[in-house]
Amino acid sequence: MAAAVPGAVSLSPLLSVLLGLLLLSAPHGASGLHTKGALPLDTVTFYKVIPKSKFVLVKFDTQYPYGEKQDEFKRLAENSASSDDLLVAEVGISDYGDKLNMELSEKYKLDKESYPVFYLFRDGDFENPVPYSGAVKVGAIQRWLKGQGVYLGMPGCLPAYDALAGQFIEASSREARQAILKQGQDGLSGVKETDKKWASQYLKIMGKILDQGEDFPASELARISKLIENKMSEGKKEELQRSLNILTAFRKKGAEKEEL
């Protein structure tokens, strides 16, 4: 073991504190502070990473974002673990100093007054990302992603019934839809007791579409989205959020309209 340097013992605690402060104040990579569940990208890694996932949701924002919208993004990024097809990423942009990632800002004609800006890249297509222009709320973005064909394990949603909902909405005849509804009804016996309430809601929506037509999911989404803005208990609000999540399964893939 090397001999101790005179004075080193007394200086160690001070040096440790100073080093800790320096680490805390130093920028964490080119995109600013890292968000758990989101991959920070720059002008080099952006072009390497996007083609490697079927879906990549990229948030373009200031280098050091904060506030309510950033908190929503943090929740979204952590929840993205439920999807095997989706990668959540973020690009921090600065138009002063080193002007970080301005090349990407110019490429996608981003307005810093509109940050955060979200784009969904599909199958490595850099030129035609799908923009998101809805509310920066976890539930709203998740429902929009689901409408774009990204599977997310959202509260209230059941994978088997999500699949049936997709088949139902794409079916071209009333007879085919009735057959899918019956398939869902027959499958209820195999659903866990705790999930039967939500499975039944899928079936109820199918019945409403058969009775009232194609516009039912959209009108019901609008109705519940407006209702949820009212003052109510957290339990009731959570239940309505689950209903919104289930309704999203009945949107055709690629639908551009976002929910509130």
UniProtKB/Swiss-Prot annotation:
GO biological process: intracellular protein transport; negative regulation of gene expression; negative regulation of protein secretion; positive regulation of gene expression; positive regulation of MAPK cascade; protein folding; protein secretion; regulation of endoplasmic reticulum stress-induced intrinsic apoptotic signaling pathway
Top-rank taxon, per record: Eukaryota
Chief location category: endoplasmic reticulum
Positions carrying Phosphotyrosine: 64, 66
Induction remarks: By stress.
GO molecular function, one term: protein-folding chaperone binding
Entry comment describing in which tissues the protein is expressed: Ubiquitous. Mostly expressed in secretory tissues.
Keyword Endoplasmic reticulum on entry: yes
GO cellular component assignments: cell surface; endoplasmic reticulum; endoplasmic reticulum lumen; melanosome; smooth endoplasmic reticulum
Signal peptide start and end residues: 1-32
Subcellular location: Endoplasmic reticulum lumen; Melanosome
Residues spanned by motif Prevents secretion from ER: 257-260
UniProt entry keywords in alphabetical sequence: Endoplasmic reticulum, Phosphoprotein, Signal, Stress response
Binding partners and assembly: Homodimer. Part of a large chaperone multiprotein complex comprising CABP1, DNAJB11, HSP90B1, HSPA5, HYOU, PDIA2, PDIA4, PPIB, SDF2L1, UGGT1 and very small amounts of ERP29, but not, or at very low levels, CALR nor CANX.
Function: Does not seem to be a disulfide isomerase. Plays an important role in the processing of secretory proteins within the endoplasmic reticulum (ER), possibly by participating in the folding of proteins in the ER.
Protein name: Endoplasmic reticulum resident protein 29
